[in-house]
Amino acid sequence: MKSAVNFELPLAVKIRKQIVQALNDFNMIEDGDKVMVCVSGGKDSSVLLALLTEIQRRSERKFQIEAAILDQKQPGFDVSKFKVWVESLGVPFHIVEKDTYSIVKEKVQGGTFCSLCSRLRRAILYDFAHANGFTKLALGHHRDDVVHTALLNMFYVGTTAAMPPKLKSDDERNILVRPLCYVSERDIEELAAEWAFPVIPCNLCGSQDGLKRQRIKKLVRDLEKEIPNIYASIQTSMTNIKPSQLMDQDLWDFKNLKT
């Protein structure tokens, strides 16, 4: 089946170049890699998957791409149309089935599901990737996610931390990469609308109101009206750390500072 994705759209070209920049800056994908793109059926990971296939076609590096989605057995989860779209890209597609929906609904009552759901989902996908010989896991987090996470940690946790572009998983068996780390959510939304691929809604987290991440997003979007480059500025600050100007004594020896 031929893909209906138009890779020559100006916005597709822009995002592809931003992905390539991230791949090069952080050495995300190397010759011989077997990359598992973790797709959710949403706009972010789907745009990533499609553009990685185009980058693969153009690249001198030889690497494999496959997609994997977790069927968590939540009501209304129908992967059939999305599966057809993924296969139209020429990408092998894995549906990993595990009922985490029942676990989350049972364990979390009266709160938000995201934290537990994410931990369970990660563990299952890490196991699948390791068992099937994948060398990299590509995640669909974009620039806005990185910025929102930094502020969430600062406001609610008291740490200066965000989403790194490349890291070793907690179980130390997998390398995770975030090729969309330079790409804005608005650009992804616009391209997804142009391509009009099938989207699988999340009836678990998508049904919750008042999430902290949503509050942070609204805050930054409101500030963006006064500070147009706020997302780029916050992200750039993460590449320009000055330990002597902070308060972490593990990074800077304040006690022994003398003239």
Curated annotation (Swiss-Prot):
Its EC number is 2.8.1.-. CDD domains: TtcA-like. GO terms for molecular function: 4 iron, 4 sulfur cluster binding; ATP binding; metal ion binding; transferase activity; tRNA binding. SUPFAM superfamilies: Adenine nucleotide alpha hydrolases-like. InterPro entries: Rossmann-like_a/b/a_fold, TilS/TtcA_N, tRNA_Cyd_32_2_STrfase, tRNA_thiolation_TtcA_Ctu1. It is found in: Cytoplasm. Its main location: cytoplasm. It comes from the Bacteria. [4Fe-4S] cluster binds at residues 114, 117, 205. It is an enzyme of class 2 (transferase). Pathway: tRNA modification. Belongs to the TtcA family. Homodimer. Catalyzes the ATP-dependent 2-thiolation of cytidine in position 32 of tRNA, to form 2-thiocytidine (s(2)C32). The sulfur atoms are provided by the cysteine/cysteine desulfurase (IscS) system. The thiolation reaction likely consists of two steps: a first activation step by ATP to form an adenylated intermediate of the target base of tRNA, and a second nucleophilic substitution step of the sulfur (S) atom supplied by the hydrosulfide attached to the Fe-S cluster. This is tRNA-cytidine(32) 2-sulfurtransferase. It comes from Bdellovibrio bacteriovorus (strain ATCC 15356 / DSM 50701 / NCIMB 9529 / HD100).
